[in-house]
Amino acid sequence: MATVALLRSLRRRELHAAHISAYKFSSASAGGRTTELRLHGVKDIIAVASGKGGVGKSSTAVNLAVALANKCELKIGLLDADVYGPSVPIMMNINQKPQVNQDMKMIPVENYGVKCMSMGLLVEKDAPLVWRGPMVMSALAKMTKGVDWGDLDILVVDMPPGTGDAQISISQNLKLSGAVIVSTPQDVALADANRGISMFDKVRVPILGLVENMSCFVCPHCNEPSFIFGKEGARRTAAKKGLKLIGEIPLEMSIREGSDEGVPVVVSSPGSIVSKAYQDLAQNVVKGLKELRENPDNEIQMKLNVPHSSHSS
């Protein structure tokens, strides 16, 4: 079976980790990027990242990808690079093993107009991935170069949370066009978001902007906002860093329900306020990538404008 052969290959590669030069991290290369994993037919690759777990990075990546495909009418792929905690199969309602084409490349599983690949599709459900770094890097190589992505406008990469070796290696070896940093408004999450910003700066990946997830909770009875995790923390952080806030996503039960049921909220409730927030985020990402192409020297600061949320005052 192709997926079994893949996992055996990964184990062999772990034993020969010294030969995985494409993913070998060197502090001397921190100032530049390699092109080892440039993907044929993929115009742009963007990372959706967070400095810590639990801030809604994966739900943001999923709804952003679906909004890019359906609202912006683009050809989109979604790579679940969160190897230790893959959640894309559940959120996108995909559970079938990927097929292998005549070139021995895996064919991504498609749903909601998005081509998806995840380690969660290749291992048994609930099976723990007790892997060391080289094996993780080898797996990610298989899920990029070993996949027939076809022609894509954007490949959205759901990054592992944090700023460790895996995140740095992915950022260096995938030809990232830009990164989106997801955070909640509270100080502890923003401190970790700052570390993520610094990491992408060091590996010279342009930052498209920050997304403030769980920005507020709007009472369904009185329509009054409650700023449970703080107010406008990501906006202030973006301003201090000279970046832009490109999305504000409210705390809403429909996001959680959609994630658990495998129906992204932009599909289940396309006219809702929260879906509009994801659609605005998608449009801002497209604008940011367009600006980078037109102004390649302007790698960090995106001239985007996100109006204050109607619940911010």
Swiss-Prot record:
UniProt keyword annotation of Membrane present: no
Major location (coarse): mitochondrion
Any Pfam family the entry gives: ParA
Effect of gene knockout: Homozygous mutants are lethal, seeds failing to germinate or arrested seedlings in early growth. Loss of mitochondrial complex I and low levels of a 650-kDa assembly intermediate associated with a reduced mitochondrial translation activity. Heterozygous plants display delayed bolting and flowering, with small and highly branched inflorescences; they also have sporophytic defects in female and male gametophyte development.
Residues the record lists as binding ATP: G51, K52, G53, G54, V55, G56, K57, S58
Gene Ontology CC: mitochondrial matrix; mitochondrion
Alphabetized PANTHER family for the sequence: IRON-SULFUR PROTEIN NUBPL (PTHR42961:SF2)
Task of the protein: Essential during early vegetative growth. Required for the assembly of the mitochondrial membrane respiratory chain NADH dehydrogenase (Complex I). Involved in mitochondrial translation activity. May deliver of one or more Fe-S clusters to complex I subunits.
HAMAP family, sorted: Mrp_NBP35
Family of the protein in this entry: Belongs to the Mrp/NBP35 ATP-binding proteins family.
Named cofactor requirement(s): [4Fe-4S] cluster
Compartments reported by the entry: Mitochondrion matrix
Transit pept. (range): 1-22
Cofactor annotation remark: Binds 1 [4Fe-4S] cluster.
One term of GO molecular function: ATP-dependent FeS chaperone activity
Record field: transmembrane: none
Protein name, entry field: Iron-sulfur protein required for NADH dehydrogenase, mitochondrial
Record bears the keyword Transport: no
GO biological process, one term: mitochondrial respiratory chain complex I assembly
Keyword tags: 4Fe-4S, ATP-binding, Iron, Iron-sulfur, Metal-binding, Mitochondrion, Nucleotide-binding, Transit peptide
